């Protein structure tokens, strides 16, 4: 797979992407929050600035109460409506809508992840984007939309405040023309330094977060308790904290200095020079009343504050954009594995590999070389070999998790690419070496879907997987919760018990082709014997493929393929390979020595 440098989108483009994403999920919520933010700030401007100025002017001009109420009542109604709508919306509507955005965003990502070929997960860049998108995307989608709403609100309020200033005293524009660029560029300088500080903190924070996870994740508990690595990890955590403090101390000083200088200069200009100018025009020249003076002064303060916070908001947009960029890269990733097969899948068929080669993406050396073999319907076939021989890779190719880089795999006489991937994979029941059980009830772990459990089939699967005796001791039967993740009374199966449940899942599926990757790895001798008996007793139309290092499991196979360095070096029955006295026989004798 050729890796292309992904196109990087602008902050504006990523913000619009977030808006579109959220609007598709919750259009009403998206529109209302925009109106709530913009109109809410406009109402606040009228309430705190224009209404006060109007009332003072009315008093100064000795106008009637009716004149005051003419403006006061509409503003009061607007404030009341704003408060009522905000209270109702924030308490009853927003929580559910935010949860919907979170849930549907994750569902989109889950569906995208499920549609992509396994090779994508070998790409560390892709996997990193996937993890970040899963963890951070929902918050940064809503965060970017919120930042956009706030920016639009600030622009709207600034335009209204500016228009009011010009309507009262057009010459104030000279002050604003000087003040606004000063505020803008000062804000940019502060923002640039804040972003630099954040960029330096992020990698240190990630190291700190990683060490923290080691201390609270159950996966590491046994190693922490039996080893002596805790002091080292605690030192790493302390060092990370000190490093972040040093970065903040170093970078915060110029930020504080710029903030103080900006606020002091703006305060001197607005509260000193500009306010004196307004008093001169109002009291000496009589150009406008005290109410208008207060309105213009407050509008100028508002305008200056909105410009400064709008500039500081740029860092917020950039921060959201970093995560949305990862979300976009992930969501726009195309599946390079073709899935345009149209042939109907036969009820059963042989699998044949001809001169199959495979090289993992990013590797130069092939993992499989010129592999030719067959798995006939009803056969029990074993794949054996030392670690790294290519056995698990061969299984991934059979399942079409990867496509061969050379040669062909056929099923029922047709290239497997001629079938729909979902139909083809539906033929298989697989117990992977790194299988997982889900923190839900036993029934769902066996059925692996939402259909009602067939109790008779499930009972038979548990008996064949040697879990039946343990199952009879579980008070809640198939409703037993596995693990204590969500239920304190849940059942925590041992390693061997987990493997038996996972095997029962495969047997319950009753697939035409069963693949067992190290099925006896965690089983005791009695359970291993039961497994061997189960495999040999499976109906004659079931193809069973077993990968195992324990040759006591594979000796009952109809055919054995011995792999080494990505090639099949021996094949035949157990008896035939023993007589050949090759690598298989050598491996078998080495294992047999342990039991003498």
Model-identified regions with their sequence ranges:
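ABC-fold ATPase nucleotide-binding domain signature/coupling loops
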Residues: 130, 366, 468-501, 510, ...
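ABC ATPase nucleotide-binding domain helical subdomain, centered on the C-loop/LSGGQ "ABC signature"
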Residues: 408-410, 425, 443-488, 532, ...
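An intracellular "coupling" helix at the cytosolic face of ABC transporter transmembrane type-1 domains
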Residues: 24, 132-144, 196-203, 213-216, ...
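Cytosolic ends of transmembrane helices, especially the final helix of ABC transmembrane type-1 domains
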Residues: 229, 293-332
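Membrane-integrated ABC transporters
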Residues: 1-44, 60, 65-70, 90-94, ...
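C-terminal portion of ABC ATPase nucleotide-binding domains
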Residues: 477, 533, 550-596
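Helix-to-loop junction immediately C-terminal to a conserved catalytic motif
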Residues: 398-399
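A hydrophobic transmembrane-helix motif
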Residues: 43-54, 149-191, 246-297
């Amino acid at each position: 797979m050729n890796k292309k440098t992904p196109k990087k989108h602008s902050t504006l483009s990523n913000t619009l992407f977030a808006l579109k994403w959220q609007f598709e999920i919750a259009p009403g919520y998206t529109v209302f929050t925009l109106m709530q933010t913009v109109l809410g700030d406009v109402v606040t401007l009228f309430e705190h600035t224009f209404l006060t100025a109007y009332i003072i002017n009315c008093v100064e001009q000795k106008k009637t109460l009716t004149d005051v109420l003419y403006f006061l009542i509409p503003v009061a109604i607007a404030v009341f409506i704003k408060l009522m709508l905000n209270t109702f919306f924030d308490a009853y509507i927003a929580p559910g809508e935010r949860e919907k955005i979170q849930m549907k965003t994750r569902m989109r990502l889950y569906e995208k992840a499920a549609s992509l070929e396994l090779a994508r997960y070998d790409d560390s860049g892709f996997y990193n984007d996937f993890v970040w998108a899963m963890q951070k995307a929902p918050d940064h989608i809503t965060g970017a939309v919120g930042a956009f709403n706030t920016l639009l609100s600030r622009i709207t309020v600034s335009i209204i405040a500016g228009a009011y200033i010009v309507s009262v005293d057009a010459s104030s524009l000279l002050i604003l023309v000087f003040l606004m660029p000063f505020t803008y560029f000062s804000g940019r300088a502060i923002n640039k330094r804040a972003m630099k500080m954040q960029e330096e903190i992020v990698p240190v924070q990630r190291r700190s977060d990683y060490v923290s996870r080691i201390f609270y994740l159950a996966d590491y508990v046994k190693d922490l308790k039996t080893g002596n690595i805790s002091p080292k990890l605690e030192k790493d955590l302390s060092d990370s904290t000190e490093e972040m403090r040093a970065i903040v101390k170093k970078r915060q000083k110029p930020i504080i200095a710029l903030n103080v200088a900006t606020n002091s200069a703006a305060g001197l200009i607005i509260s000193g020079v500009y306010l004196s100018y307004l008093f001169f025009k109002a009291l000496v020249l009589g150009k406008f009343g005290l109410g208008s003076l207060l309105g213009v002064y407050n509008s100028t303060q508002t305008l200056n504050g909105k410009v400064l916070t709008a500039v500081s908001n740029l860092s917020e947009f950039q921060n959201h954009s970093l995560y949305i960029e990862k979300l976009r890269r992930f969501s726009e990733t195309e599946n390079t594995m073709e899935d345009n097969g149209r042939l109907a899948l036969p009820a059963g068929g042989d699998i044949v590999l001809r001169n199959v080669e495979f090289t993992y993406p990013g590797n130069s050396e092939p993992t499989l070389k010129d592999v030719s073999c067959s798995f006939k319907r009803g056969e029990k076939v074993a794949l054996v070999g030392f670690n790294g021989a290519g056995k698990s890779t061969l299984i991934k190719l059979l399942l079409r998790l990867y496509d061969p880089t050379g040669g062909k795999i056929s099923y029922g006489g047709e290239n497997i690419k001629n079938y729909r991937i979902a139909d083809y994979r539906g033929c298989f029941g697989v117990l992977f070496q790194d299988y997982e059980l889900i923190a839900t009830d036993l029934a769902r772990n066996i059925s692996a879907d939402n259909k009602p459990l067939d109790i008779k089939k499930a009972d038979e699967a548990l008996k064949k997987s040697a879990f039946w005796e343990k199952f009879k001791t579980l008070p809640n039967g198939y409703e037993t919760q596995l693990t204590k993740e969500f239920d304190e009374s849940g059942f925590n199966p041992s390693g061997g018990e987990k493997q038996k449940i996972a095997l029962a899942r495969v047997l319950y599926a009753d697939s035409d082709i069963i693949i067992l990757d190290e099925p006896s790895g965690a089983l005791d001798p009695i359970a291993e014997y039961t497994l061997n008996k189960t495999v040999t007793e499976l109906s004659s139309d079931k193809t069973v493929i077993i990968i195992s290092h324990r040759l006591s499991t594979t000796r009952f196979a109809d055919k054995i393929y011995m792999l080494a360095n990505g090639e099949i070096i021996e094949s035949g029955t157990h008896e035939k390979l023993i007589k050949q006295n090759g690598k298989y026989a050598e491996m078998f004798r080495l294992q047999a020595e342990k039991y003498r």
